[in-house]
Amino acid sequence: MTETPNTSSEEIQTSEPSPDNELQVLQQENANLKAELQEQNDRYLMALAEAENSRKRLRKERTEMMQYAVENALMDFLPPIESMEKALGFASQTSEEVKNWAIGFQMILQQFKQIFEEKGVVEYSSKGELFNPYLHEAVEIEETTTIPEGTILEEFTKGYKIGDRPIRVAKVKVAKLPAKGNSDSNEEKE
């Protein structure tokens, strides 16, 4: 019988945690909770950053969509404006009555150009400039030895841009040096 009580006191001693063991367990739990809190905090900050990035991206996309919508609307006005400019160019060759009408149309044309300016649309001149495929479309090439190759000889349609970005490239005639084979065959014919 004496053995039984000894066994139970040993069991009691092992089942009751010592203050050192209890402290270690609490410290471990504390470390685990801190790590979990840090992980949750990191997730929260990541979600917050993603939400902010999404807001910025949506704001930028909305601005770009509005800009492209304005550009497309303005592009639709370019052909009639250019036609009006050409027609007004001939107004000086007509009667006084037509010249008076032309003054009114000139005012309307100026209003259109003012709207374009307010929206940041500017026309650019190409004649005499070097050909730039970003700003020009070569619709005609003329062989010449008097003008440097790549120089724009004539502008058929004006180019327009907003900032540095063209919204319509200029259609131009570009100078090109004659091919060497062509000059040899011309000399043989003579």
UniProtKB/Swiss-Prot annotation:
Q: What are the entry keywords?
A: Chaperone, Cytoplasm, Stress response
Coiled coil residues, start to end: none
Listed as disulfide-bonded, the cysteine pairs are none
Q: Where is this chain primarily localised? A: cytoplasm
Where composition is biased (Polar residues), the residues are 1-18
Q: Which GO terms describe its molecular function?
A: adenyl-nucleotide exchange factor activity; protein homodimerization activity; protein-folding chaperone binding; unfolded protein binding
**Classification via InterPro entries:** GrpE (IPR000740), GrpE_coiled_coil (IPR013805), GrpE_head (IPR009012)
Q: Which Pfam families match?
A: GrpE
List the Gene3D superfamilies: 3.90.20.20, Head domain of nucleotide exchange factor GrpE
Q: Which GO terms describe its cellular component?
A: cytoplasm
Keyword Nucleus present in the record's keywords: the answer is no
Q: Where is the region Disordered? A: 1-21
- One Gene Ontology biological process: protein folding
What is the annotated localization of this protein? Answer: Cytoplasm
Description of how the protein assembles with itself and partners: Homodimer.
Role description: Participates actively in the response to hyperosmotic and heat shock by preventing the aggregation of stress-denatured proteins, in association with DnaK and GrpE. It is the nucleotide exchange factor for DnaK and may function as a thermosensor. Unfolded proteins bind initially to DnaJ; upon interaction with the DnaJ-bound protein, DnaK hydrolyzes its bound ATP, resulting in the formation of a stable complex. GrpE releases ADP from DnaK; ATP binding to DnaK triggers the release of the substrate protein, thus completing the reaction cycle.
PANTHER family xrefs:
GRPE PROTEIN, GRPE PROTEIN HOMOLOG, MITOCHONDRIAL
Q: Which family does it belong to?
A: Belongs to the GrpE family.
Name of this chain's protein = Protein GrpE
Q: Which organism is it from?
A: Chlamydia trachomatis serovar L2b (strain UCH-1/proctitis)
User: Gene name on record?
Assistant: grpE
